[in-house]
Amino acid sequence: MKKHLLSLALIFFTALSAIAQRTITGKVTDSGGEPLIGASVLVKGSSTGTVTDLDGTYSLAVAADASVLLFSYTGYESKEVPLGTSNIVDATLEEGAEQLSEVLVTAIGIERSKKAMGYAVTNLSSSDVLQRSEADPLRAVAGKIPGVTITGAGGGPGTSTKINIRGFSSLTGNTQPLFVVDGVPFDNSVNATTGAQSGAQFSNRGFDIDPNNIESMTVLKGAAASALYGSRATNGVIVITTKSGSKGSRKGLEVTYNSSFQSEQISGIPDYQDVYAQGSNQVYNGGFIGNWGSPFPDHVDRLNATYGTNYSKVIVPGYPEGTVPHPLVSGGFAGSRFPSVFPNLMKDGKAIPVPLRPYDIIGPFFRDGGLFENSLNINGGNEKSSLNAVVSRMNNEGIVPNSHSGRTSVSVGGNAKLDNGLSVSGNVTYVNSEQKTPPSGGSVFGGNFGSTDGSIFTRLFFLPRNFDLNGINPEGIPYPFENPVTGTNVFYRALDNPLWLVKNNYFESDVNRVYGNVALNYDVTPWLALTARGGMNTYSDFQKNVKVAGGVADANGEVWTNDIKNTEIDLNYLATINTNFGENIDFRLIAGFNWNQRSYGTRYVVGDGIISRGLYNTNATVTQLSDEYNRLQRFYAAYGDMQIGYKNYLYVGFTARNDFSSTLPAANRSYFYPGVNASFVLTDAFDIANNFLGYAKLRGAWTQVG
């Protein structure tokens, strides 16, 4: 009897479950009848939802009390459809106004229609940034922004990137634009101390931005576009909105994992002559570093026949014709000073003979590099709120041995609309960036082989062509490049061996950065909104440079450290009026106040004379020299932006900003930036858009900034 009662109970509850919900199916299309793939279908007021398939169809189990389905798709107007008795619900979505008139985030986070702008603006999406696999988000968009030149300082991982927006120049050579991330200024400095670290290639701090977390990138190219940022925007502005900082909301839950790998190889090397061997005055000299000696034996007859010269093949007493004493143990090279290091290259008390011929010195020195990146993006929400989280890791091994950069980024952000007209948003990002590189910068064509820049390329590119840097001795053992007992360099008397440099000398940087913001918006009336936004951007950068004892330029060795702290706090308070006067005139006025504080501090220590091999810190040096620098700046600003539009084709805008700086004399701390711009859309005004002329606009601007 108990078994029958249990079976009856199960049947009863199953029947209740079937009655409590039903399955809705349908198709989502655009106005032309084309299916919309991946459109969101959500039960209004809940988190129950799904997305359409490749045919635009969907199937969704809904509760019995569900009353409305909400359909949405990127670039289209959302649509609410009441649920009746039918279990088939189709929806047709209309193209959104934002597609017809693109809206961009411009100065101070202001959103503006692109056709209303009286200045040049370029906008890039996340797909534009991720299309090219690059560790640096700025290099990822090189060549994609008209009028903007983006160049790297070198091919090494983590090296700096220079940006120049057309029309901006500086007597000091600083043409870097202002970076703004999620409405907060973002320091993009190259933290290099002049004279303290020669031969190193530093990163811009824009390297700390994770490309996987970029929702959009907007470049404000004119002074009129950037005037609301004041003097910092003299060279233009790059506005970045992150995925965790964007205000868009996605219905339901989406998890995206991306993984990419890019192989890197040296793109090319200079053309080298392979006609003349080491020496000078066209005479072979095993103790001379230059390539101005006798011709290689294979070229003697050709040169004499072609130019009527009287060259003869090199003959070194005691050696067969066409051979010379092994360079590593003759002349000014280390074998003549450290013969015990090269016993296998000696025979009967003298250097073994080797053919006098050119070798490929440069190519084998480099290695294949690689960029490996993984990212996880979690995005979820409903019609009133959303949450986004991005976690990523990047590793970049450079083409120069022992060169590396890496970045770990964790970002969380979200936004919510409350019932009383309030909305709140915020995001925070933590980034750890590391860089390690041998001294691959510095002067390549300096001419002084013993100079203190310590650059690998200074040493590498001017070696005699008949020297086999990457060779092996007769017993199959690679040529030694350091003394096995002391670890000192063994090479030419005025040169560090490039292989010794990449093993021992290095520059490294470890950056920890936190940035984010919180914003509160209150819609007082349909035409008046108040906004308060606060953000902070802070990082520490610990740098170390090691020059091991035993080199030519630094015989005693040197350790240099630099501890940098940088913090910026930025507060903005805005009032926005957005209304119409009749059917033809649109009016928008923004008035705001900005408070900004920047603190910067650095303490560097130079230790000379390394005491113990392998122990590389400033405390383990004979003498230390230290210095410290600190700076605190505070700025206040009042600003305004007014725009008047007529029939959606004629726009006039006025901007003004007044700054007050703590770093200027008390009697002259105020400076003013006015501006005016206009836009006239010809194709809309005269209704002349056609297949030949789809869009035409006149624009102009005048602004005082700098």
Predicted regions and their residues:
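Short glycine/threonine-rich loop-to-helix capping motif typified by GTGT followed
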Residues: A666-S670
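Short, well-ordered amphipathic alpha-helices
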Residues: V181, A200, V239-T242, V412, ...
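Short, small/polar-rich motifs associated with maturation and membrane association
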Residues: M1-S411, A416-S425, V431, Y515
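Residue-level signature of outer-membrane beta-barrel architecture
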Residues: T242-S244, G380-N382, R393, A416, ...
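Alpha-helical support elements that line or immediately flank enzyme active sites
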Residues: A196-Q197, G516-Y522, M536
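Surface-exposed loop/interface segments of Gram-negative outer-membrane beta-barrel transport/assembly proteins
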Residues: Q99, T175-Q176, G248-L356, G398-S403, ...
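Transmembrane beta-barrel architecture of outer-membrane proteins
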Residues: D136, S160, N235, L371-S375, ...
